[in-house]
């Protein structure tokens, strides 16, 4: 129980750094999958512009698959950490087992979509036959072989919930390295491997994900000894599943809203294919920065959930304070890098006709990173304190209620020739700032009614 003692006794600022750094690296490497694919695809000799557009269009579905898996993992993470904090290993075993049962169900749905749904989805966003063909090929492979990313996401959260985030990072590094090695081999054709283009990018991605999942499965079996493991614990338990999704469903919806937002933004930008591609490329850079906040959030949530389960008001408040402080520092670094080096990122993707749109998007949307990062931290805090509804409210504001109407209205002025495409990019910083204001109010409320009621701090 050394890991639980660490969660209980180590100073929160040191604990958050110790747990947060591996998680931040893990999330950053997860974003690398998409960036590496786009970088190699953008440098194809033939059809690179169409291929980049295709990857932009398939991205929302990739995000949605990850959303469901990670959201399920987030619920598992918080519930498992809280259960361990309450010293209930029997329930913890059921939580872990039921999460894996849910993974099987999630994969079955992704498989069916990969077989029957990808053509209609891609065709809804473009009429270019080359883009449609490339998009179908790439997305079908990712869906049919999605079990890698699904079970990686679940085992990652099981390891994080017990304080073993280093092992999840090792698995992620292995997957990223496999992906990076295989991308040029399978895309361009090196040695005995034939040139496969965008299909090669898809295969490289899923093989990397499968490698990560297998390694994390081994780590889970070997190191997670706080609770029993076995197929018997995968038997569905309605109470456990409801407990997982009472926390995880808002996280799933939050991630799913990102997919919906990107899909609708693709439709809004459909009048300009170069701007559409530029948005897709920038979104992958933006994810790389925001995934740093997501990684820290994944340290914030189990730490606060654990001490909330133990009833330690001081450590809860420390978790909130340090979580927000570290997030702001990370986002400030992200803003600095993206504002100083937009041309370098454009060169990485060989952006072509999309270059100027991409640079404008980076300079404008990057302003929003500070507020976006704080919003992500707020959501991690809410989830740890059983504040799923508050987390959902922030997600709805950020990805639906404010951003899409605002971008839609701005696009009218752009299509009429009154303003340039850059006007649409301003919808993002405006949205994040307004959402951050609401998030602050919700944080004050949840601290008053969830943390304020705690009186016994003997366990802290």
Show which residues each predicted segment covers.
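Transmembrane alpha-helix boundary and packing residues in multipass membrane permease domains
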Residues: 23, 27, 39, 78, ...
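Short alpha-helical transmembrane segments in multi-pass integral membrane proteins
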Residues: 1-20, 80-147, 193-249, 304-368, ...
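Helix-terminus/linker motif at the lipid-water interface of multi-pass membrane proteins
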Residues: 28, 32-53, 122-129, 185-196, ...
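Transmembrane helical elements of multi-pass membrane transporters/channels
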Residues: 18-37, 141, 175, 208-212, ...
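N-terminal transmembrane alpha-helices
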Residues: 7-39, 43-47, 60-75, 79, ...
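Small-residue-rich hydrophobic transmembrane alpha-helices
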Residues: 52-112, 149-168, 278-336, 340-342, ...
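Short runs within selected transmembrane alpha-helices of multi-pass transporters and secretion channels
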Residues: 73, 142-160, 168-176, 201-216, ...
């Amino acid at each position: 129980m050394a890991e639980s003692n660490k969660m209980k006794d180590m100073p929160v600022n040191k604990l958050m750094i110790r747990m947060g750094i591996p998680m931040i690296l893990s999330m950053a490497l997860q974003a690398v999958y998409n960036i590496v694919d786009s970088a190699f695809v953008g440098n194809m000799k033939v059809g690179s512009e169409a291929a980049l557009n295709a990857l932009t269009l398939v991205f929302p579905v990739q995000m949605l698959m990850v959303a469901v898996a990670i959201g399920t993992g987030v619920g598992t993470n918080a519930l498992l950490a809280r259960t361990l904090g309450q010293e209930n290993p029997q329930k913890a075993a059921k939580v872990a087992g039921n999460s894996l049962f849910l993974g099987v169900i999630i994969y079955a749905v992704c498989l069916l979509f990969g077989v029957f749904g990808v053509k209609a989805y891609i065709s809804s966003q473009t009429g270019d036959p080359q883009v449609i063909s490339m998009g179908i090929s790439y997305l079908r492979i990712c869906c049919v072989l999605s079990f890698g990313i699904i079970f990686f996401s679940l085992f990652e959260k099981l390891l994080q919930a017990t304080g073993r985030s280093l092992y999840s990072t090792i698995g992620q590094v292995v997957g990223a390295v496999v992906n990076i090695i295989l991308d040029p081999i399978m895309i361009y054709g090196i040695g005995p491997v034939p040139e496969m283009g965008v299909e090669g990018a898809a295969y490289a991605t899923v093989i990397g994900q499968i490698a990560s999942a297998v390694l994390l499965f081994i780590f889970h079996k070997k190191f997670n000894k706080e609770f029993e493991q076995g197929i018997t614990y995968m038997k569905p338990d309605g109470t456990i599943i409801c407990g997982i999704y009472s926390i995880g469903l808002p996280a799933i919806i939050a991630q799913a809203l990102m997919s919906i937002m990107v899909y609708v933004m693709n439709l809004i930008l459909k009048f300009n294919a170069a701007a559409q591609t530029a948005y897709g490329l920038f979104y992958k850079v933006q994810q790389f920065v925001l995934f740093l906040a997501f990684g820290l959030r994944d340290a914030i949530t189990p730490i606060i959930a654990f001490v909330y389960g133990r009833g330690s008001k001081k450590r809860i408040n420390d978790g909130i304070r340090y979580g927000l402080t570290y997030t702001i520092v990370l986002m400030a670094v992200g803003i600095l890098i993206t504002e100083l080096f937009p041309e370098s990122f454009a060169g990485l993707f060989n952006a072509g006709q999309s270059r100027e749109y991409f640079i404008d998007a980076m300079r404008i949307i990057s302003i929003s990173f500070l507020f976006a990062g704080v919003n992500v931290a707020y959501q991690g805090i809410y989830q740890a304190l059983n504040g799923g509804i508050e987390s959902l409210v922030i997600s709805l504001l950020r990805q639906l209620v404010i951003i899409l109407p605002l971008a839609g209205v701005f696009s009218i002025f752009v299509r009429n020739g009154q303003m340039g495409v850059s006007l649409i990019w301003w919808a993002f910083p405006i949205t994040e700032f307004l959402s951050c204001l609401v998030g602050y109010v919700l944080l004050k409320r949840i601290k008053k009614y969830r943390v304020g009621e705690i009186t016994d701090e003997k366990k802290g």
